[in-house]
Structures are given as structure tokens and as C-alpha cells.
From Swiss-Prot:
Its EC number is 2.2.1.2. Keywords: Cytoplasm, Pentose shunt, Schiff base, Transferase. The keyword Transferase applies. This is Probable transaldolase 1. Belongs to the transaldolase family. Type 3B subfamily.
Length: 214
């Protein structure tokens, strides 16, 4: 399973990319708005940092406008992926963009049927939302497993991006469930990096080294 970072914060992207485990970036209108910067400016800077897929999301709700927005996003950089909401209009846009050779990421997926429809429409990626399903008492990991099984059974090349990842356990369970990618907030990466036994082990090594020098 590969890692994308789910943020539009350039400093977070730089810090994560420096550690070598980031393969791409996902953004959405909320994340970009949080930065208080121009969308194109933010995306251009991100593409200069990470050499991998960068998802930028449309804000229109009808297919024709999504297609036009998608074409504009795709022209920003060859690594751009157009993020499209899981609706009938969204899938109509995915079909056209796919035919034009533009990569798409269908977002806000909450069922295996939605994922299958998106894949058959030509989506490069589907993004099932793990944490938001957990919030309403559903099991997001069952959804990941179901989608992975369906895609494998039918030889569907669409990749699964686990989204709405809230904590390190989500990450491990997504990897076990068959997700191709987990898109993870920087704060969760920070949690994944740390373990109290690692810290105490480092302290002991340093203490032993200092004692040996005396």
C-alpha cells in the first residue's frame, strides 16, 4: 500500500516528502480554502514538491461544468488527477474526461456499488471514506474489503484510495483490507512515526554511550 498525504498545506507536504514515504497528494476545496491562498498557486507549488499524482477537486455539480473544470485542472501539470464527487453527473464527467486521457479520482464513496459504478465509468481511483462511515456506526473497513474483493475478482484496474483516515489503526487495517493507497493527514503520520519504546530505547543507547566514554 502506498501513501498519499491529505492536505493543501505546503509545509506539511515538504516535511512528509522529506521522509521519503509520500507517493502523491490529495486536496479538496475545504483544505485549499483553509490555506487562504489561490488554488492554482497552491497546486503549482505542490507539484514542484511531490513527483506523483496530485488530486485537485472540481466545485461544480453538473457534468458539463465539471468537465470544463477538469480540463483546466489537468492542464496545470501532467501529474494532476481530477477529483469528482460520486454522483450521476460526476460519473458522466468521469466518462468524458477518461476518454480524453485525463485521470480521475471519484470521491465521497460510501458503498461498494458506488465504487463499482465509478470504476466502470472509467475512474482511475475511487476514494471510500473510512472515518465518516465509522462516525455513523457503519464499518468502513468492511467497505474497503468489499471493494478490493470485487475489483480483484473482475480484474478492475481502478485503484482504491482509503480516505477519511483518522488514526494509525485505520492505516494498518486499510493495508490488510487491500487498499492500494491510504491518503493520510500529516498529524496521523506523526502518530505513526512515534512509539514510547522507540523513544526510551534511544535514550538508553545514548546513556550507555555516554557512560562508556567515561
Amino acid at each position: 500500500m502506498r501513501f498519499f498525504i491529505d492536505t493543501a498545506n505546503v509545509e506539511e507536504i515538504k516535511k512528509a516528502n522529506r521522509m521519503g514515504f509520500i507517493a502523491g497528494v490529495t486536496t479538496n476545496p475545504s483544505l485549499v480554502a483553509k490555506e487562504g491562498r489561490d488554488f492554482n498557486e497552491v497546486i503549482q507549488e505542490i507539484t514542484s514538491i511531490v513527483d506523483g499524482p496530485i488530486s485537485g477537486e472540481v466545485v461544480s455539480l453538473n457534468a458539463e461544468e465539471m468537465i470544463e473544470e477538469g480540463r483546466v485542472i489537468a492542464k496545470i501539470h501532467p501529474n494532476m488527477v481530477v477529483k469528482i464527487p460520486m454522483t450521476g453527473e460526476g460519473l458522466a464527467a468521469v466518462k468524458v474526461l477518461t476518454e480524453e486521457g485525463i485521470k480521475t479520482n471519484v470521491t465521497l464513496v460510501f458503498s461498494a456499488t458506488q465504487a463499482l459504478l465509478a470504476a466502470r465509468a472509467g475512474a482511475t481511483y475511487v476514494s471510500p471514506f473510512l472515518g465518516r462511515l465509522d462516525d455513523i456506526g457503519d464499518d468502513g473497513l468492511v467497505l474497503i474489503r468489499d471493494i478490493a474483493e470485487i475489483f480483484e475478482t473482475h480484474g478492475i484496474p481502478t485503484e482504491i484510495i482509503s480516505a477519511s483516515v483518522r488514526h494509525p489503526i485505520h492505516v494498518i487495517e486499510c493495508a490488510k483490507a487491500g487498499a492500494d493507497i491510504a491518503t493520510v493527514p500529516y498529524k496521523v503520520f506523526e502518530q505513526m512515526l512515534k512509539h514510547p519504546l522507540t523513544d526510551s530505547g534511544i535514550d538508553k543507547f545514548l546513556a550507555d554511550w555516554e557512560a562508556a566514554k567515561k
